[in-house]
Each structure stands twice: as structure tokens, then as C-alpha cells.
């Protein structure tokens, strides 16, 4: 009796304990989905002890729980979904090494691995441009951009002049705490003279001598992204005057103000100013200011607090940088026109379309059409479809005669043949943009909604003297 018990015990042990040896039937493991291989008594035979939810000799099928009346059915390897992080399981005759797995995981953006279990570090490919700092997130990343850049990848520049120097910002938008009066009140250094590079005997703003807390303020008329400021001094009665240091404040309503702080502290930032009366000095704001009003508070001045200045930045949405008319990035051959005027019918005084560049200098420094009618146009080929969000126009003088475009329409095209005139969405008719009122002041119009096109045409609608134009387009080339 004892001998028979021992025999049965040995048999039970041989059946219940997996034997793993070199060349064993269980090496490699033929059981899938974590099944345990149990060698059989006969050579080459085995059985699989399957985990819960799997069945078949190799544990390759998933048990689907059915209703009481139905028999359990096999749902395949994709139920339940073995893929993590929203991965999609697809049936496939795929192998992992020597093992047939029966499925593959299609991973969403930002994940990889057999089961989409790994978060990809997107910062490894350095997606942030122009000095942006990348932070890896779950299935994503973010870029901390320098003040003068913006966009998902810091790809958009945001440091164009906002219009103090060019005149887009009007006299009424520039105010100050006080005005200096000299020569028995005959000389008045008003705040609206505080325009960068302004010429003349009185060419800057100066605060009154008894003003203990002077400031100068710019009303941008809408909330904008301000990324920097350029300051400049001036000479008064032959004496250099300038601001050596200053603080900046900003507001959205002109009543409640916040001082610009040193990043990460509650300390007011003191910006370095000028060292002479004429050299411009620029400071950038990182992070940028988003506000309608900007104030500059002089802290230390040489003699009197005297200032010429320009604000830098862009619209809140970004994508409002000069596209290259003034800089020359847009080349001469890209600018064409309906007709050309020659003063005194002389070739040396030909007002060609390539000269229609904002702030162009010289005797012949703009485009003038050969005819004064509403069929004239100036065209710019941007070479690729471009997002155009604004336009700046300017007139010129022909031998002392003031000439400018008082109003205009815009048209756009992608092939240069089929044109669409920009519409006023509210009135559902062609939009007529307000142009210039003199030969030199910049006039900016925002194009909202923007134009997406390769070719842009300016269609003069009214004019003074002759149709004469200098211009700049604003926008950006769309990037993913």
C-alpha cells in the first residue's frame, strides 16, 4: 500500500511541475498571452495553462463572456485591447521573435512601443526654433519662446515697429504727464514729437522741469503683443539730453496699471537707456507685454528727460511681420503694375513698380501709374501661398508735387489669372480701404479675416495728384 501511494505521488509530481531542460518542448514557450507550458508524458507533447480570459491549446484566443443562453465564443487577441494610451489593435499575422502574436498596435502621436506604452520625447528633435526652450509633455511638447518670437515652434517673428516713427500711431495716441516749454513758451516739446529719428529744431518730447514723476504713454487702440522698445535722445539748444534708465508699465483700460517685473520676482525691471543724444538703444521684453496702453517712466536723465522712441511687436495673433517690400526680400521682378509714368517723358524719371517700397528714398522713389483711372493696379507675387494680415501704404512727391492714393481695394489670386476682390463681410460688397492723406505718413490697414494667396493686387480707388504708391505687406508663411 505504501509503495502504490509513492508511485502515484511521483506521477502527480511529474504531471504538475513543468520540466524545463535544454531542447525541451517548452523552450521556446509555445503558449501565448502569458500561458505556462507543461510538458506531457509522451515525447513532444505539452499542454498550456492559460491565464484568465484566454483559451485554445496555445492560449491564443480570448474568451468572450456571453449571455446565459450562449456558449462562450473566441473574440481574438484584440479583446480586451492590449494597446495602451489610446492605441488601436489590429489583427495581424505578426510574429515577435519566434512567437506568433496575432495583432499589432497602431500608436497615436506621441507614443511608441509594442503596446504604445512609451511616451516619445518630442524635444529630442529640437522642434523649437529661434532659441526657444522645449519642454516634453505627455504625447506633446511646448516651446517657451524669446520675447520677439511666437508660434507653436517660435517660428513667427514679432518685432516689427508698431508705428510711432512711421506715423501709423497718430499724435492723439501719444500723451504725457507734462510738456517742456522753452524760449518764453515759444518752443513746446510735445509728446507726439517723441518719434524715433524725428528731424527738426524741435524733434523730441521733453518733460517739464518741475515734473517729479514724468511719463509718456502710447495708446495702441487695441490689445497688442509688445516685445520691445527703442529709445533715443535729442539735442536742445545744442545740449545733448537723454534718458539713462527707465521703467515700463502697461494697462488694458488706461486706468489700472501694472509695472513690468524682473522675471520670477516682484521687483520692477529697470531698463538701460541711452548714452548719448542720437544713438538708438533697444530693449526686448521677455515675456512680452500684451496690452493696449504702454507707459515709459524715466528714472535717470541727463539734464532733461528727453525722448524719441518706437515700440516693437505685432498683433496678438502674430503673423503680422513685414513680408519684404521695404527690406528687399521681395525682389524687383516680383513687383509688377498695370502701367508706368515717366516725368517729362524721360527714362531717368521712370516711376517703376519695383520702386513701390515703403520709405524708399531718392528723387524717383515710388510707383506711379501711367493713367489715372480705377483700372490701375500694383501686383506683388509672393512666390508661395502666404497669409497676408495687413498692408501699409505711403505716397511720395514728384518734383515737389504731393501725390498719394486716398483709398483702394485689394484683390488676390493663386495662379495670377483668376482674381477675387476682397469683400467687406458685413456689407457683402468690395471693401474699400482708407489710404493716405499726405505723401509721407504711413497708413496701416489690418486685413481681417486674412488673405491666403500667392498674388496680391492693390487697386487704387481714389487719389490725389497722380496714383503714387509705396507699400509693405504684413503677414507670414504658414508653417505646421
Swiss-Prot record:
The keyword Cell cycle does not apply. GO terms for molecular function: calcium ion binding; integrin binding. Residues 24-60, 74-117, 119-155 form the EGF-like domain. One of its GO terms (cellular component) is extracellular vesicle. It is found in: Secreted. It comes from the Eukaryota. Ca(2+) binds at residues 119-120, 122, 136-137. Promotes adhesion of endothelial cells through interaction with the alpha-v/beta-3 integrin receptor. Inhibits formation of vascular-like structures. May be involved in regulation of vascular morphogenesis of remodeling in embryonic development. EGF2 and EGF3 form a rigid rod via an interdomain calcium ion binding site, while the long linker between EGF1 and EGF2 lends considerable flexibility to EGF1. This is EGF-like repeat and discoidin I-like domain-containing protein 3. It comes from Homo sapiens (Human).
